[in-house]
Amino acid sequence: MDEIIKANELHASRIIDSTTSLREGDIAVSSGRRSKVCFARSCLWNKSVDGRVYIAYRLSTEYTEMETKLIKKGMENVEKGTCVRFVPRTHQEDYIDIQAKSGCWSYLGARGGRQTVSLQSPDCLQVGVISHELMHALGFVHEQSRFDRDSYVTVMWPNIWRDRLRNFEKFRTDNLDLPYDYGSIMHYGMYAYSQDGEPTIVPKNSNTKDIKLGQTTSLSHIDKLKINKLYNCGDMDDN
């Protein structure tokens, strides 16, 4: 998440266009559609009869061959151990359109029709960043947005940029009966939006003081469990 914050503070306005803005730093929200409804199961991608969730995508022709390979590695991160499969779009009406726009961001969950995922080159073309934005497209918010997060972390409000305080709001999320995941690829880092170099989020329990918040490379085991539970896939192999 630190890489996303850095890229978006440099390149992406919090206002994408006249009807869309960014919430929590990288979640696109349209004024005509409240993204909170996507915390429910109404914004899921359809599951196929074979038990997998096939998500069609289209890649911008602006990406180089190497950049395309990185994006596909980010997809493979999400696919491994889950029922999700990303497939090149042919005729599908619902699909993600991956574009090299300004900053790194995605809409939350399936919206129907074409929906943009922005992966600006080169700042957003890191495998972990790509996987993070695809997780938003699957319907997942940031881990520290969980309604029960105050039992696990302390938000250090005085250390946060004043105009970014709303990025630390809590929401009535469906936690899928899974534990709080300090190592989720969807968790803010300890210094996210720090105005003075001091931590903005710290683990609450003494035995978790040395735990690193978030990660930048791959999904955690719990991230994968979340996908399979949200989409009712059961246990999936890594093929």
Where is each model-derived feature located?
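Zinc-dependent metalloendopeptidases
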Residues: 1-239
